[in-house]
Regions:
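Membrane-embedded and interfacial regions of multi-pass energy-transducing membrane proteins
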Residues: 1-550, 554-645
């Protein structure tokens, strides 16, 4: 409750987002049960609307984004040679806001008012004229709360990456994951204010009688669509770029080759982010914007496929000629490359307005974005879990169980979503809760529903693997994979201070410089000539010879003598010196961020009382919780960050 350690906050993000992944998966399973056969009777039309709305909202805002945030928290300080993030308490605050916001959003299930307007909440369907109850209020307020969390984290990570890189860690030496995370933070801080404006307008229309989206009063429902998709399409890259970064860490390690075209990978990520703000209206070709607007946004949609395609080929060339090791993490990474390509091809089709008009709001679109976000984002994130689990926990995951997880999930994803292309082309609209016999959709829907069973089995095995391996997995050591970046130079799990001495970096692959200099002979280094980085671990020198760092007398705790492909030979663990013993100042734990987040959430949620015709109660509650939040914030600001050493 009081931690401000970025690694523990990463664990909190990971556990919470995986819990909501199960909840979102349950919602999807009920949807597929309803659609498995014609005229399904599993749920009512009203419940179906709530299920698909909350499934989309949960998977995007409560699963993929915070699961990416777990990796941001764990890896960014470790990869840049920092001891923590720039603002540790703000980091804790962003997690607690996410937790309380996600709980608030899902409380709606228990009061019979789950959001039911679709995850992009088109007006006027979400205005009071068509939605009288609290359903949309929970959605509007919940997303505003979650937006505060995302913005706080975004500014924190931008500051961390700019200001806290180790000596010699120039921008063009940062690991690709940190680069993609850096780009994502700019997307967040630029995109989330737009959706906040849209939500505030809708909130004012619903709560205070304004007319931003009310047609009869001169409002414009298309304003919502423009504002939402100016946020919504960059959001796609907020969801996928972290997975791209993880894949760009996994493939070089298990190919035993540096990443092909590192600068191009960086610039393509920047270009994707830049162009991502110029393609939003391809979601709106069906609303009648006119031929000029359709042409402009169609061309922009074609252009954004270029930097994305560059990444695909760079990953392929990274593996080409390498010594490949097909670990579970590698399987997930390769699968992202293959399946995201399918999602990209089905997506660039919609750069053509005539084709888009035929496919809009059909299951073809559902197939497309699930190939991007499940076969793309989730495959990459699962690969990241398998790759970094040893660093999180100090234990190895079971590769046999990992293979079962991968293959069942792989089969399930393709069996679920590939047939949706055809049901969509045969004319099946999305969001219908039942369909008649004889439409030609029966086989495709049954296959999609069977595929969910495979996904459930795969995820269940994966979760069992995660839970079991925390305690009984093989000891990992510092670097079980023979990886090239700084995070693998320190003990697993890392000490609270990360690095006993801040390392000096002379190339993109500091550990390969130490362990396998032949692999980095063509990588640019600093002007220090042939001198290689000497990473300090736990107060001890790592050494420079051999493929993997050895464990000399008095050497680092848990260092591995493993060469890829050979059995792991862990070192018996010994106690690491504490930050106090080493004289390293570290931020103190604090409960204040939790209180600020709690009272802020309660302040937002108090507005619900307005729709119960209890305006005076709402005012009293808002003022009370705002005062409590302000008092907690003063306590936060007046408490010293660190003890004096």
């Amino acid at each position: 409750l009081t931690t401000v350690d970025h690694k523990r906050i990463a664990a909190l993000y990971l556990g919470t987002s995986l819990f909501w992944f199960l909840a979102g998966g349950l919602e999807a399973s009920i949807i597929r049960a309803q659609l498995a056969f014609p005229n399904g009777k599993v749920v009512s039309a009203e419940m179906f609307n709530e299920l698909f709305t909350m499934h989309g909202t949960t998977m995007i805002f409560l699963v993929v984004m915070p699961l990416s945030a777990a990796f941001f928290n764990l890896l960014i300080p470790l990869q840049i040679g920092a001891r923590d993030v720039a603002f540790p308490r703000l980091n804790a605050f962003s997690y607690w806001v996410y937790l309380f916001g996600s709980i608030f959003l899902n409380v709606s299930w228990f009061v019979g008012s789950a959001p039911d307007g679709g995850w992009f909440g088109y007006t006027p369907l979400t205005t009071l004229a068509y939605s009288h109850n609290l359903n949309i209020d929970f959605w509007v307020l919940g997303l505003q709360i979650l937006g505060v969390s995302s913005l706080a984290a975004g500014f924190n990570f931008i500051t961390t990456i700019i200001n806290m890189r180790a000596p010699g860690m120039y921008f063009m030496r940062m690991p690709i994951f940190t680069w993609m995370a850096f780009i994502v933070q700019f997307l967040i801080v630029l995109a989330f204010p737009v959706i906040t404006i849209a939500l505030v307008f809708l909130q004012f229309d619903r709560f205070f009688g304004t007319n931003f989206y009310e047609i009869a009063q001169g409002g414009d429902p298309l304003l919502w669509q423009h504002l939402f998709w100016i946020f919504g399409h960059p959001e796609v890259y907020i969801l996928i770029l972290p997975a791209f970064g993880l894949v760009s860490e996994i493939l070089p390690t298990f190919s035993r080759k540096p990443l092909f075209g590192y600068p191009v990978m960086v610039y393509s990520g920047m270009l994707i982010a830049f162009l991502g703000f110029g393609v939003w209206a391809h979601h709106m070709f069906a609303v009648g914007m006119g031929p000029i607007a359709d042409t402009v946004f169609g061309v922009m949609t074609m252009l954004i496929a270029i930097p994305t395609g560059v990444k695909i080929f760079n990953w392929i060339f990274t593996m080409w000629g390498g010594v490949l090791r097909f670990t579970t993490a590698m399987k997930f990474a390769i699968t992202l490359v293959a399946l995201f390509t399918i999602g990209g091809i089905s997506g660039v089709m919609h750069a053509s307005p005539p084709a888009d008009l035929q496919q809009t709001d059909t299951y073809f679109i559902v197939a497309h974005f699930h190939y991007v976000l499940v076969a793309g984002s989730m495959m990459g994130l699962f690969g990241g879990v398998y790759y970094y689990f040893p660093k999180f926990t100090g234990r190895m995951l079971d590769e046999t169980l990992g293979s079962w997880h991968f293959w069942l999930f792989f089969i399930g994803v393709n069996l679920t979503f590939f047939p949706m292309h055809f049901s969509g082309l045969y004319g099946m609209p999305r969001r219908i809760y039942r369909y008649d016999v004889g439409q030609g959709w029966e086989t495709f829907n049954l296959l999609s529903s069977i595929g969910v069973i495979f996904q459930i089995l795969g995820v269940a095995i994966g979760f069992w693997n995660f839970w079991r391996s925390r305690n009984v997995g093989a000891i990992a050591g510092n670097d079980p994979w023979g990886a090239p970046t700084l995070e693998w130079s320190i003990p697993s799990p890392p000490p609270d201070y990360n690095f006993a001495r801040v390392p000096t970096v002379t190339s993109r692959y500091p550990l390969w410089d130490v362990k396998s200099p032949a692999l980095t002979s063509e990588i640019p280094h600093s002007r220090l000539g042939e001198e290689r980085v000497e990473v300090e671990v736990g107060g001890h020198h790592t050494g420079k010879v051999g493929h993997a760092i050895g464990n000399p007398p008095g050497g680092p705790v848990g260092a591995s003598t493993r060469v890829p492909g050979s059995p792991l030979t862990p070192v018996p663990p010994r106690r690491l010196p504490t930050a106090h013993e080493l004289g390293i100042p570290m931020p103190n734990p604090s409960i204040k961020p939790l209180f600020v987040a709690l009272f802020m959430t309660l302040m937002f949620s108090s507005l619900i009382a307005i729709h119960k015709d209890k305006v005076q109660l709402a005012v009293v509650l808002v003022i009370t919780f705002a005062g409590a939040m302000t008092a907690s914030l003063y306590g936060w600001l007046l408490t010293p960050l660190e003890d004096e050493h």
